[in-house]
Amino acid sequence: MVHSQLPVVALLRLLCALLLLPSATMIPGGLSPRSVTDPDVQEAAEFAVQEYNALSANAYYYKQLRIVEAQSQVVAGAKYYLTMELMKTKCAKTTGKPKVYKEIQNCELPPKAQQEKLTCRFQVWSRPWLQKIELTKMSCN
């Protein structure tokens, strides 16, 4: 009788061990590393650059050089935590219609001696079913 229970006990132990292993999937509420090339990360980065330029008092536009790091968190939607490098361009902000992301990315950079690079941390909250995306935090240095 004891021998017939051994496979069941072993199977239960294996199942318990598997349940305790960390999961590679996104955990609701937890931060998960993301590839900087994921389309939703790219979309959040574009939005962050657009908002940075709209909110900053700089006379010139800044464009995205690269996404250094990306993480996301499942909340009521998705929150993206982005660390990005931005560079000041030669494109001056003028009154009227502001430039969109793709136009800003086409702006020329000043000569090396005049270049200004920023490292920025952005939090972008996306709720696609509401067609809402917003910049919730921004800090650059």
Swiss-Prot record:
Motif residue range(s): Secondary area of contact: 73-77
Keywords: Disulfide bond, Protease inhibitor, Secreted, Signal, Thiol protease inhibitor
SMART domains assigned to the protein according to its UniProt record, in alphabetical order: CY
Site (Reactive site): G29
Superkingdom of origin: Eukaryota
Disulfide bond annotation, renumbered to this chain: C91-C107, C120-C140
Phylogenetic placement of the source organism: Eukaryota, Metazoa, Chordata, Craniata, Vertebrata
Similarity comment: family membership: Belongs to the cystatin family.
Any Pfam family: Cystatin
Tissue specificity field: Expressed at a low level by the venom gland (at protein level).
Signal peptide per UniProt: 1-26
Protein name stated in the entry: Cystatin
Main subcellular localisation: secreted
Note: Negative results: the recombinant protein does not inhibit calpain-1 (CAPN1), a C2 family cysteine protease and legumain (LGMN), a C13 family cysteine protease. Does not provoke cell death (PC3 prostrate cancer cells).
Record function comment: Inhibits various C1 cysteine proteases including cathepsin L, papain and cathepsin B. This protein has no toxic activity and its function in the venom is unknown. It may play a role as a housekeeping or regulatory protein.
Source species: Notechis scutatus scutatus
GO molecular function: cysteine-type endopeptidase inhibitor activity
GO cellular component: extracellular exosome
Gene3D superfamilies hit by this protein: 3.10.450.10
The Cystatin domain, residue ranges: 29-129
Location(s), subcellular: Secreted
